[in-house]
Regions:
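Transmembrane helical cores of multi-pass ion-transport proteins
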Residues: 1-347
Length: 347
């Protein structure tokens, strides 16, 4: 539910203030892990306030013109950050392929719990998930076939729709299972509450029972997160920009303003902190996006899904969602930089 709300407004705002056409604003695995780490023992009000404060901090960075600091970040650092993020995303999605459920607080915790719950794996999820990955990767390469003219364009559209095709086929399979009354051999997604979120101010204090928590008390609890998460989100957006800039310039200061507007506005619909999503950005790049206007299509689809499609989310197998994410994010790993770095300095 929070994920849908977080993805809803960012696209509309980034379309206006953003500069990187590949960036897809919304919730990410990286932001979710960081937010969970800082607020896991706190009420949900802290998450919304954290979103607002992240926006304020990003706005201050933009007003102070701190975008030049991003230029000091070397290519290997950006590449390492992107690769590490891709690794975290893939690792967090392995449980979906295995068909197991657990919550992981960190990379080490996820690995430990994968080993701990490995005996609970479900063959249905594994077979369907791996088949989906193979299918998606094969369809991804269709556009490289040596054909010309209209056939090439048709094949390009088929290749482009690979994720949607896999999703619809899997939903149809789930529907057939449910219609026949046969138990599902794999786990499916949960339904979400339909309807749009209500507009309300971020919680600058709250009352729980006989206890009143003031704004200074709330800010003290998230004091570290207010600085760490905005910095990571800026680095994420800039990393995406550099990954697709092909040597071009990156307007880091403007990206700070765009992130600030997305998070401040998002806090009014109870969003979590957001930034550019590596996975969705990879999907957008593969789709041949030309401008930031692509965000409006994604946001409109999320809006329609929130209003009308939430009752059907239970038809989507979890392993299919994991397959789509893994198939997209593995191409963010920068293999080419390893060889020159190895030749430059082996110590």
């Amino acid at each position: 539910q929070v994920g849908l709300y977080s993805a809803l407004i960012g696209g509309f705002i980034y379309m206006i203030f953003g500069t990187v056409k590949q960036v897809s604003m919304g919730p990410t695995s990286l932001m979710a892990l960081l937010t969970y780490e800082y607020t896991k023992n706190l009420p949900s009000q802290y998450v919304v306030l954290l979103t607002f404060m992240c926006g304020i901090f990003e706005m201050l960075m933009g007003l102070l013109r701190l975008g030049f600091l991003v230029d000091l970040i070397s290519t290997p650092v950006t590449s390492g950050f992107t690769t590490a993020t891709a690794f975290i995303i893939v690792l967090s999605q392995v449980k979906g392929i295995l068909g197991v459920k657990f919550k992981g607080d960190s990379v080490i915790d996820i690995i430990e719990k994968l080993i701990e719950h490995f005996h609970e794996r479900r063959n249905g999820d594994i077979y369907l998930g791996l088949a989906a990955i193979v299918f998606i990767l094969i369809m991804r390469e269709l556009h490289n076939l040596p054909v010309k003219g209209k056939i090439k364009r048709i094949i390009w559209y088929v290749s482009l729709s690979r994720n949607t095709t896999v999703l619809l086929i899997s939903m149809f399979i789930t529907y057939l299972y449910e219609s026949s009354g046969t138990p599902l051999p794999y786990l499916t997604s949960e339904t979400a509450k339909p309807g749009l979120p209500s507009l309300q101010f971020p919680p600058f204090g709250y009352t729980s029972g006989n206890t009143t928590v003031t704004l200074p008390q709330m800010l003290y609890e998230i004091r570290s997160a207010m600085f760490v998460i905005p910095l990571v989100s800026v680095l994420a957006n800039v990393s995406i920009a550099k990954a697709y800039a092909n040597g071009g310039t990156v307007e880091a200061t403007q990206e700070m303003f765009a992130l600030a507007m997305c998070n401040i506005a998002g806090s009014f619909i109870r969003s979590m902190p957001t930034c550019g999503a590596f996975t969705r950005s990879a999907l957008i790049q593969a789709s041949g996006v030309r401008t930031t206007m692509s965000n409006i299509y994604a946001s409109c689809l999320i809006l329609l899904a929130t209003l009308f499609l939430t009752p059907y989310f239970h038809l989507i197998p979890r392993c299919i969602l994991s397959s789509v994410l893994i198939s997209a994010v593995i191409f963010l790993v920068d293999y080419q930089i390893v060889k020159p770095l190895w030749k430059t300095n082996r110590e």
